[in-house]
């Protein structure tokens, strides 16, 4: 029997979205693309998990119960989490787009255009793999 080299780890995507249908659709789509998705329903459950990978990408819904997606990102950055992030939201107003841009985060409008979200996540992951 030949020893096979270990399978490379799939890139990690941390998804925080309180809508189960969105979370399921993103998880299914990204799984088909070879991405490893961990889903959380709100900011507090992600923060309590303490299980962030060293490398990966955050996909944060803006409209979360409790902390919104950008407040969650601020909290993570304050705790020295430097993973790239993508913000997803419905009907983003100009002030929200400005806040996301100031945080260095692309925003993708939902209903999700899966290709746009996948492109943004792949771009973020490519930057950390260099």
What are these regions (language model features)?
Residues 1-14, 20-21, 27, 77, ...:
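Non-catalytic signal-transmission and effector/linker regions of two-component phosphorelay proteins
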Residues 20-38:
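Two-component/phosphorelay signaling modules centered on CheY-like receiver
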Residues 39-57:
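Acidic, metal-coordinating helix/loop segments flanking the phosphotransfer/catalytic sites
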Residues 41-42, 68-71:
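Acidic catalytic/metal-coordinating carboxylates
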Residues 61:
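Active-site residues of response regulator receiver
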Residues 65:
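The feature encodes the CheY-like receiver
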Residues 71, 91-108, 115, 119:
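Alpha4 helix (beta4-alpha4-beta5 surface) of REC/receiver domains from two-component response regulators
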